[in-house]
UniProtKB/Swiss-Prot annotation:
One of its GO terms (biological process) is anaerobic respiration. It comes from the Bacteria. It comes from Nitratidesulfovibrio vulgaris (strain ATCC 29579 / DSM 644 / CCUG 34227 / NCIMB 8303 / VKM B-1760 / Hildenborough). This is Menaquinone reductase, integral membrane subunit. The Qrc complex is composed of four subunits: QrcA, QrcB, QrcC and QrcD. Can form a supercomplex with the [NiFe] hydrogenase HynA1 and the tetraheme Type I cytochrome c3 TpIc(3), its physiological electron donors. It is a multi-pass membrane protein. It is found in: Cell inner membrane. Belongs to the NrfD family. The chain crosses the membrane at residues 23-43, 61-81, 98-118, 143-163, 176-196, 221-241, 270-290, 316-336, 341-361, 383-403. GO terms for cellular component: plasma membrane. Keywords: Cell inner membrane, Cell membrane, Electron transport, Membrane, Sulfate respiration, Transmembrane, Transmembrane helix, Transport. Its main location: membrane.
């Protein structure tokens, strides 16, 4: 067969029946992303070489942008475990068309979060202490082990996608390994759902047990504060639509249809339903906190906020109503959900709402004065914190770009773009 010289030089590596841009355009895009990645690497080097003193963190704000970023991307990456649960355990077949992307996004979110934690712990050479000298009375221990194990599960789920590259899969051994991985995928999906559920909850439970921080302290059920359950529900209420948003962004950038509207709408319906369930419990929790728990501690609802915009009540109302109730209604009602503008707006608001929740639970909780001689404190992340965060986003863009170009992520792509 004569070679088609109109195709990119690496066309033999592309998924079967799929077109990609020229290699020169792709390399220009990768170089553009690598500029931001390089800036982040420099910031990471400065942090590792000189310590946390180069950041905006201090003795008052041990948690800041990095922990907010970690908690947000871990929640948004929940589309991986929840979509996997629905696809492989509950056998919702249409999700097979987007599950590969959900797995990659989950892997990027979790691996990126662990990379940020390497910087945030201050002394990465002692990172192994959390495993070897585990504090069995701390919810952070559960978080450490569950995140690590689930990241390994995501790697296992990502490997067969790599092995399905058109050229790699021609090897009989590689083909057999990839096939057997797929056969065992329901097992890994179940393990992933178990691990992710517990670490999502423990991240919330970690805040809920801090009785010295009235903004986040909660009573609960048995050994788990209510924030344990709220974190799980908020994650599954936002993760699926974040996957859809990433997919849509890729479609806009590549000019190709990757997933059918029916699949996106289904993901939105699932997210909207779970978001509404979360909001029911969130409203109940907020009411009980404001009218029962705070008064019993000798505090008032108004003391938890300032009159300014940084720690004002507007963020609570934005989280609950504009970025909570509004997107939930849009995603649940078919007539509203099937309007693309409303659908994508609701998805964006949903993700913003979860990010606000993680921010106020992390930063605002530390800013509130808890002693008579305390005052409201302010926190502003500096360039080193922003640089490291941008590095993770750039890392995700690099891996996702390579995966899209060379791996069969989207089963519907060839059919949707058939001329």
């Amino acid at each position: 067969m004569d070679k088609n010289y109109n195709l990119p030089v690496d066309a033999e590596l592309f998924p079967e029946g799929c077109e990609r841009c020229s290699l020169s355009k792709f390399m220009m895009w990768m170089a553009f992303v690598f500029v931001f990645f390089g800036w982040g690497l420099y910031a990471a080097y400065r942090v590792l070489a000189e310590g946390l003193g180069v950041t905006g963190l201090d003795d008052y704000f041990g948690f800041g942008l990095w922990i907010t970023f970690d908690l947000a991307v871990i929640a948004l990456g929940a589309g991986a475990f929840f979509s996997g649960l629905l696809r492989y355990i509950l056998n919702i077949d249409p999700l097979k068309n987007i599950i590969n992307l959900a797995v990659i996004i989950g892997f990027l979110c979790y691996s990126g979060a662990m990379l940020v934690l390497v910087l945030d712990i201050g002394q990465p050479l002692r990172a192994w202490f959390g495993y070897w000298h585990a504090n069995v009375h701390s919810m952070l221990t559960e978080v450490i082990f569950c995140i690590t194990c689930y990241c390994l599960v995501l790697i296992i789920e990502y490997v067969p996608l790599i092995l399905e590259n058109r050229q790699l899969n021609k090897n009989k051994l590689v083909h057999a390994v990839a096939h057997n991985f797929h056969v065992m995928m329901p097992l890994f999906a179940g393990i992933g759902a178990f691990l992710s559920t517990f670490h999502q909850g423990s991240l919330g439970g970690m805040y809920g047990v801090l009785f010295g921080r009235p903004y986040i302290y909660r009573e609960g059920f048995f050994i788990w504060p209510w924030t344990f359950f709220l974190y799980v529900l908020s994650a599954v209420g936002s993760g699926p639509v974040f996957t859809v948003l990433v997919c849509t962004l890729m479609e806009k950038m590549t000019g190709r249809k990757l997933v059918s509207w029916e699949v996106k709408s289904l993901m939105g319906k699932i997210a909207g339903t779970m978001l509404m369930v979360y909001l029911i419990f969130k409203f109940a929790d907020t009411y009980a906190w404001a009218y029962d728990l705070l008064p019993r501690q000798g505090l008032t609802f108004d003391q938890m906020f300032t009159s300014g915009w940084i720690y004002g009540k507007w963020m609570l109302w934005a989280e609950l109503f504009y970025c909570g109730l509004v997107p939930a209604i849009i995603l649940i009602v078919p007539a509203l959900r099937n309007n693309p503008v409303l659908f994508y707006s609701a998805a964006i608001l949903d993700c913003i709402g979860i990010t606000i929740n993680r921010y106020v639970m992390t930063v605002q909780a530390l800013a509130i004065p808890v002693m008579p001689f305390d005052s409201w404190e302010s926190y502003l992340p500096n360039w080193a914190e922003w640089g490291a965060s941008v590095m993770i986003v750039a890392y995700a863009a690099l891996v996702l770009s390579l995966s899209y170009r060379y791996l069969p992520i989207f089963p519907q792509e060839a059919e949707l773009n058939r001329k």
